[in-house]
Design a protein with these regions (language model features):
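Extended catalytic cores of very large enzyme megasubunits
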Residues: 1-257
Length: 257
């Protein structure tokens, strides 16, 4: 145990001298205190998840001159390797991925990126209207979505439900489902569920109320729509069904007609 602590201290001291590369090409010393705080935030309220262990694993994956945007990726990889030790590490890993996604989306929309605070509700509320407008402008979202009361829907978002994701579920959404432009994801998880809900509620008489009902159901994970609905609801290609059933006679002419 003493040797392990000594190795950890030596490892930490050596990383105090590392430089990280910023987006403008300049470099600055690695802020180990900030990194430790970020990891503490990802571990909050997760039993059997050890902040120090994730920090040690992350430091092993850092190198001098590493781009600052790569540090979150190193953190994700490091936390992911610990899932075998305790299942709760999957939630810590998902939170690290969430932080990356928040930064990616808010940077794209030119919004403040200091999002890992206690004000997730304010961030989502402010972000949501920008997200809808940009999605419409990029011809990714149905212009009819702008006819909804976006203020009301933004306030109905439940940012705390972002914490429900396991790493694999969030990574799957990130890789396959979230809206993106030029390979940049700008759709956050709760906006994703609300976009689907809005697409489903477009023809309803009280469409905002119905959208909120659909959103609350989807974002609770009590019900999940089929893949075509997740892909297409609220977009310019509103195909919602997975398949179509019809009746044909038992001969090739009918089958191919």
């Amino acid at each position: 145990e003493e040797r392990r602590k000594m190795r950890a201290e030596t490892n930490t001291q050596s990383h105090l001298q590392l430089q990280v590369s910023l987006a403008d090409g300049s470099q600055r010393p690695l802020d180990l205190t900030q990194l430790s705080l970020l990891i503490s935030e990802t571990c909050k309220d997760l039993s059997e998840v050890k902040h120090e262990l994730i920090l040690q694993e992350t430091l092993r994956n850092l190198y001098d001159g590493m781009p600052i945007l790569e540090i979150d990726k190193a953190l994700i990889i490091s936390a992911r390797t610990l899932v075998e030790q305790d299942p709760n590490y999957t939630y810590a890993t998902a939170r690290s991925l969430l932080r990356t996604l928040y930064t990616e989306a808010l940077d794209f929309l030119e919004l403040p990126t200091a999002v890992y605070t206690n004000n997730h509700a304010g961030v989502y509320h402010h972000y949501f209207q920008h997200y809808i407008k940009r999605g419409v402008a990029l011809e990714l979202l149905d212009p009819q979505l702008r006819s909804f009361d976006l203020e009301k829907l933004g306030k109905a978002l439940l940012p705390e439900r972002d914490q429900q994701f396991t790493y694999l579920s969030l990574q799957t959404l990130y890789d396959r489902y979230f809206l993106h432009a030029d390979d940049v994801r700008f759709e956050l998880p709760q906006a994703f569920f609300m976009r689907i809900a809005m697409g489903l509620a477009q023809q309803e008489s009280n469409k905002e109320d119905r959208a909120i009902e659909f959103y609350q159901l989807l974002s609770s994970f009590d019900y999940m729509a089929s893949t075509p609905t997740l892909f297409n609801a609220g977009t310019l290609r509103p195909q919602l069904s997975s398949c179509f059933l019809t009746t044909v006679a038992d001969d090739l002419d009918q089958i191919y007609s």
